[in-house]
Amino acid sequence: MSDVARRIYQYGTWLMLVVIIGQFTAAGAGVFSTMADDASGAYILRYHTIAGPLAVLILSLVMIIAAFIGRLPWRMTALAAAFIPLLFLQSLFIIPYRYPTDIPTLGGMPWLSALHVVNALFIFWLAFQWPVWTRRDLRELSQRRAGPNELEAKPAQAAMHV
């Protein structure tokens, strides 16, 4: 079961990257379509604001569960969990732009919404690095569990097949 959970975690990191790229694409398409008075831009932005964050949240929760079941190191569990507060910050940073009259103090600071893009870039960087870090961590984990005797035997076996 833990091997299956590790595979789910490993493939989930790539899926998260695809979802985040989809979020960037939807945001750009939605903004530029809306600026061009294309009504389809509103639907694309609706995906960006509802379906995309929901997919990131659900995938993060699945990854946290997979990390626990797979008995992965805490660092790997924390990486999966890191997307949740970053997602929460995304929602907070857009408030001054989307709802300027609801919270007058924040409405006077529309520049604060620029942090929405900065945070999105950090989320993208994290999602981009995550599969690489996961591959490295899983390789180190399997080497530690294999023990020194098995690691010494593998090069000898490889030399015999040459």
Model-derived segments and their meaning:
Residues 1-162:
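Polytopic transmembrane helical bundles with strong interfacial aromatic enrichment
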